[in-house]
């Protein structure tokens, strides 16, 4: 097998995970992989799955000893290729997809290849096509109707209050853009993760445990600062709440380039403007991350561009913006497990760990 074949097979495997890593025809994706993986590491990745497994199982697929496999797998963990975990003293490994996975992990590496950010940026903005939705917009709490009428999966406060294990980390997208010389001026410690996705960054040294009260303050300040709440997870479990600025977030930056962003990413709410209360100050238009609002004699909303984040409602000094629930036939519910691939559920990772107990 030639070097090109190895890396193309690696790309194909990564493309089958999460939102993929499509071929561009210009080789940008292969340039990234060659910077990230040695040929040996590429072969090891091809022997892994998204499920957590012990080194002995992976070694069996490769025809090497468990000790030899563990040595390479640990090196790959240090490079951000894998999700590691331990069960009953047995180290387990799972393949990390491009996103959410080794893209984010690279950001926090102190020994990161200095050429990598530019290569990744060129790929993201010059050919990357996500295979499926990654996150969903959750509206801010301001301007919503009676909280009792808000669906549980649209309630940021409710999601946080339902969680026991909460982690906070610096925004990977913000760090990525900083490495390219772009400073947006926003808060950076704004990404909240739960369960497995909180444990991993904290174990790797780039996150910290927080209480619910601090998490609530993070999302409240994020909303005030004009950041968009985006949640990840399937219908069983919310895995994270990212608080994103449209200058840095890869998803929002890509959507800003299309005229109908709301078709691809939107909450279950849409802003309504009270013409009597509105002073035409323009604050809502200035805050809108998608440029969906224009203000003249009144306020005009481009519904195709609106993602229903509610940032306009938070910033309105006159309180003239409320968030109205969309008709039931337009409501998007969190996807079922078989239809959501961006973040493998903490529930499934926990099942892997339980299955591995007693096998060491």
What are these regions (language model features)?
Residues 1-30:
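Long, low-complexity, charged/polar intrinsically disordered regions in eukaryotic proteins
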Residues 62-78:
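Short amphipathic alpha-helical interaction segments
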Residues 77-88, 293-294, 321-322:
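A short, conserved structural fragment
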Residues 51-62:
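Short acidic, hydrophobic short linear motifs in intrinsically disordered regions
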Residues 90-126:
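Short, amphipathic alpha-helical interaction segments positioned at domain boundaries
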Residues 303-360:
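Flanking helices and flexible, charged tails adjoining ferredoxin-like Fe-S electron-transfer domains
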Residues 116, 124-270:
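Catalytic cores of enzyme domains
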Residues 95, 230-238, 258-308, 322, ...:
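Ferredoxin-like iron-sulfur electron-transfer modules
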